[in-house]
Amino acid sequence: MSYRAFGSYAVALFIVAHLFAGCTTKVDYTLGEEYIPTNQNMELKRRVYRAGVMREGDREESISMASTKLYQSDSIKSSNLENVYFGYEKSPIYGDRKAGFMTQVLFGSKLDDDYGWGYRPIFDSMTLSLYITDYHGDTTAKQRYGVYEIRSNDYITNSSDSIFYINFDPTNYIAKDPIFEFTFPNQERGSYVGDIENPRYCNVTLESTYYTQEYVNRLMFTTNLAETDDYGLDTAQIYKQGNEKEFVKYVRGLYIAPIGEPEGGENNDGEKGAMFATNVENSAMVLYARSRYKEDPTIIKDTVIMSYNFYVSPTTYKVKAGNVSISRVEHTFIPEDQTSIDGNNVLISKVDGMGGVVTELKFTDEFIQSLADVVLSRKDASVSVNQAHLNIYLEGSDYDYSMINPGSITHILDKSMSRMGLYARYGGTQEGSKSDIIAIADYLYTKEANMSIPYNGYLNRSLALYQMNISNFVQSLMMAAAANTNEEGKVQFEKFEPGGELARTRTIYIAPAADALFGFNRQRVIGGDVEIDGLTNSAPITLEIVYTIVN
């Protein structure tokens, strides 16, 4: 830099300094300091409840986290679902489960105004058109079924509830004896299950019984042909679009259920039989009839085909009669499970995807106290649960995945549900209210979502477990525990007992995913870490909590 330039620069600095010479500026560094916590301390901690021990850092404490029981609710909605279910399975582990379905029907086409079914029509045959979308068990094992006529619609007209459940009993509304019978599957007669990845229609020929002809006569208006000049005429025009309400009063529908036990032998697990799901809107009963020439009744004129479609959505098809379909599921549990339902704690629990038993997980007093102690460990502390992972292990699994036997666990994994849900209420619990199914806060379920939900709940095949993020649930339980303590910091457990205001905060129901409450898969899961008759589980349910504490 030249001296001349340096001189100009110095002059400039002098001028700026002179301009501010008369100004004084005082900075107040205390502004807002009342909002800054004094002596603030923030720590991130991790604790694990595993096999009856709580570990946090170098600290270990014997704490049993949870117990498990078997629980069953019949209050699972089974009306107007996408599928209806039928079949019979027997298992030495899970007991028997049997399903049938009840459905109203609607005509598939309009009858001719002038000729109806034709002149002196003849009943030829009746088929059942199924659209199998899922199955479970031995699909080669034959099962006999009965088709019963619904004789009364009182179950709809006299009911204040438009929802029906798996325990619905159709006995008072159906005929005592079947109007048809059939065997399914029936390979000799061409009735196969098919490929569920590419479903197709499967037509089953129905076999007549003593009551078939009387039923068909009413469908075809042939009970008294003399009144209609020997034509099977629809004089009331119930087969006419717009008169669906009158139709379902006259043709009330069907109930299809297994007769007897499944045929065939047992598989390697000692199980026999099968269960099926058929898409209800793609299923129907189809009547084939023939009409004659009036001029020469010995000659067949036409073939008349009428389909009686199962449940048709009034929203989708804008029909004026909202008809109903209901699946009924019956369970006969093995004696061990029957005595354990709502009873004693179990080491190995179960989850059945078809209205069977599920697992009730109840957190222990000492676990709840340990959560309260976290909040009370520091004066005026604030605790935030960053993450809480609940791990539920399949039977045959282990904490050390290298110890899992691949040969045995693969079979178990293949039969397990792809996802499980956690619920604060599952059906008719303490109040006995039906279909009272409420997920825990973390389980935001939907069939389609544009976001990834942290709950997870999917089967981890590598570790043979289900992992659920229950951070909100644990946070709520922790706050409830800390807010309900006495002067000594002991939790007031009476509030968490049945009938108490906080009773529901300590219990979770492990059950099928919310969008798959009806499914055929079922499995045994390792239960809690509470000792039962001197025995404990090898890999009980674990909980890992990461939390931040600030004071």
What are these regions (language model features)?
Residues S2-Y9, L13-N551:
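Secreted, disulfide-rich extracellular signaling modules
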